[in-house]
Amino acid sequence: MSSSLYHPRPVLSSQRYTPSPDYLQDARRTYHDNSRLPLRETASNAQSHNFNSMVPCYSSQVGISPSVPASLPAPMIPSQSFECLYRVPTPRNQPRFQQRRPRNEVNPLYFWPAFRQYRNRQAHKDTQKDKGGVWRRPELEDAFVDSVLLMPHMGRRKFSMGGKLHGRNMLISEYIFTICVAILGSKEIFRIDNSNDSIEQMGRKQVSSHMQVVKKFFEDLRCFHFLFPAEEKKEPGSTNSDDYYDEEEQESFKSNPVLTALAEGRVPDVKPNYEYFSQLLALQSLISVRPKTAEVYVSSSEVKFRDEIAYDAQDAPLDTESFPHLNKYNNCDDSPSVLGKDVLLHEYTRSLDRTTSACVKTVTRRWQKDAPEIYETLELPTRDEECLLLEMCATLELHEHARFPSGSELTGFVEVAITNPNLQSHRWKCVTRLTRPSELHSDDKKSSVYTNETGIHRRGCSDSKPDCDCHSRPRQDIHVPFPAVEWASILSMAVQYPDVEHQRKKEKRTKGDDRKNLDRAGSKRKRSEDDGDAASWARRDLTGSDLICKVAMYQELWSCAPDSNRWVRQGIVFWRFNTTNQWYKYNPVFKPAGTSWRWLTVNDPMSRYHQQKALVYPSASMSLDSIMSPTPSINQHMTAAMNETFSSAWDPSVSLAQVPNATATNNGLTLFESFSGGLATPPPTAGLQGSYSGSFDHGMPPSTGVGFIPSTCSTAGESHPGTGHGHSHSAAYYDAQTTLADLKPVMSTVNPYQSPTTSSGLDLSSSLVYDNAECDTGLQGWDMPALDGWSTGAGSGSEWGSHHKVEPSSDQTALWTQSQWAQMAGDRDGSPRPMKRRRGDGIDSHIPPTMTAAAGGW
């Protein structure tokens, strides 16, 4: 487990992200009454060390660090109170301080009506001991819902962690495990009695089961694929199953902070961008139209039934084997309403189902490859709020020979519902563009793209009618024109390319000779057999089904207000076609006829834009108060109390750079660790003049013993004079112009406020000498009280003194004495450098100054 779980980073109260587990109302409740908060809470002067500082994202009733005795009083400056240090959170069943949190601090998925009703039903189980909801801990439900937004979309890729390949669902399980261990200390909550599976396996099954339940509440969302991406795998030798993505557009897993944190066994420092996902959910309110009906069939008004036998116009009986759909709706009331008194000869597709959303690239990338002509005419919107995108995937049942009696007519009835009441009184028009492969052209004239623009009218009205009044009466449904003439030609040409393999399999199925040894769809074949099937599948003759899949069509729906002449594009309907004769793993299979539709988005969840926008990094919510008011150390607590009583604690004549940096050593006391150097917020006595001068004269000789050097170091400097830096270097250390952001002391544990560029104002790099050239020049100066406790080692002092020569100084002789460095290097084998730190204990030297305090809040 990462050391970051034992050495928590400081989190200011203004930054702490601690959502309460109660989502039963519109917003969750906070733990405390914020009507009157002490300085710690209101001015960001300090932060509490209680609760679960290891997991700032999820609240838990966890006390202070076990390394600190419970009876030890906490340091406190006079302007603070004990309540801010030892405040106990209110339990869920005690609505003592009920106060709604801002909506932007709650996961937006909790506000989706279907999921909210489900959570309300689950709330009744929380009060029962043996039925404590899905997770039996509300924090784990919060972690699950957040992980849906946090986990990157992986497509067909896997993330290697712990010697195993992890998919997205497995990573969600690992995230919940990490939160569970950080809050509860173990994963025992996932254990199921009388089960031989490990805790990890039981937890993954629970996550997978809960995922399937939660998915159903969001299936109608336009942004569903941003939350639950489809994990369809491309099978070789399959029909119409590949979705195209550019690998260079996908964000690398190595740079993802969530996956990096899980690989290190710690809780991620980032959180979901609730505002961004709220915008994605808001796309649902911009839906203007919704598919209602999609039927394509051939009918005839001249075919008559006599004695249950159909006769054409020449009184010739029609063969039922050639027209199997003749009697499909004779004895039922489920016949198409638009059929009227006509006789149905063949039905290509009728049923309409909805599937989950996807990115528009799944369509356009295929067109870019197979139909570049129509791809060039496509003008996609730049944002999803500008225009609605949806896809209609029609699976057609081709007729065997497509020879219909005279008087037959192909009808395509596509109807959409206008869901926006403001558009129901508009005028509507449709612009259709279609392209097909050269094999499906009936004449030598092979136009590149078929284009047709026509108005959308009520039944019985058309563009040729001069007194059209379709817009005078509101209409909830509109009939989208379908290019029936073009499709009659396409379907007639497609039957000229027969599908021998599917026909052979259909005959075997009819004769009942479909034996298992001939149907190897589910068998485990060797690689040689797969290669042979792949080669034969690639060499097979072109079929009508293959050509139908290459037909591309889209329709733009435009509307115009009655009192305006400006047309606005309301939606684009993308059409994808295939047939019932399909392939799966080089084997012919059959799929039922029907049409499925889904929402499409311009925004791609696989893109770098989304994966960077979906996360909120620690610096995103930083405030100036957080930078100027870090946590005071125990020494600063005591100094503030002493100076308030005896003298002035702040002298305006003294530069801020002269404040002594007294830091605590790494003694394991998390409550007393100095995470930063001094209060930037002056105490109440800042403006009072004390009886003793607090200034420091740089020109005072070292013999006076006045300075910011500890007495032990000063004594050693007087008794053992040595070489030191010149006055120019020491003057640069004290006289450099600094800012409040530069006042960052050295710390022995992780200091999120530390930065290598901090020394730019103090010029620390020119005033320090290290025993090794490979030492990081970005390290701060040594802490004299911490070095004073080091024991002296024999022989180490000569090695240290012989390697580096320093110039004598008139001011800082006590600081750079050779004997003093020799005493400090005793326990470090001749080097005063601190011991090697673990990953989580090192100084964050990679964080820029403007983001230093941000790292502390997460």
From Swiss-Prot:
Pfam families: TEA (PF01285). One of its GO terms (biological process) is conidium formation. Residues 809-822 have a biased composition (Polar residues). Coiled coil: none annotated. GO terms for cellular component: nucleus; transcription regulator complex. A motif (Nuclear localization signal) lies at residues 514-521. Disruption phenotype: Leads to abnormally shaped phialides and abolishes production of conidia. Residues 128-221 bind DNA. Keywords: Activator, Conidiation, Nucleus, Sporulation, Transcription, Transcription regulation. The keyword Transcription applies. It is found in: Nucleus. It comes from the Eukaryota. GO terms for molecular function: DNA-binding transcription factor activity, RNA polymerase II-specific; RNA polymerase II cis-regulatory region sequence-specific DNA binding. Residues 500-522 have a biased composition (Basic and acidic residues). Induction: Expression is positively regulated by flbD. Residues 1-22, 500-535, 792-858 are annotated as: Disordered. Gene3D superfamilies: TEA/ATTS domain. Belongs to the TEC1 family. AbaA and wetA are pivotal regulators of conidiophore development and conidium maturation. They act individually and together to regulate their own expression and that of numerous other sporulation-specific genes. Binds to the sequence 5'-CATTCY-3', where Y is a pyrimidine, making both major- and minor-groove contacts. Plays a pivotal role in conidiation by regulating cell cycle pathways and other conidiation-related genes. This is Conidiophore development regulator abaA.
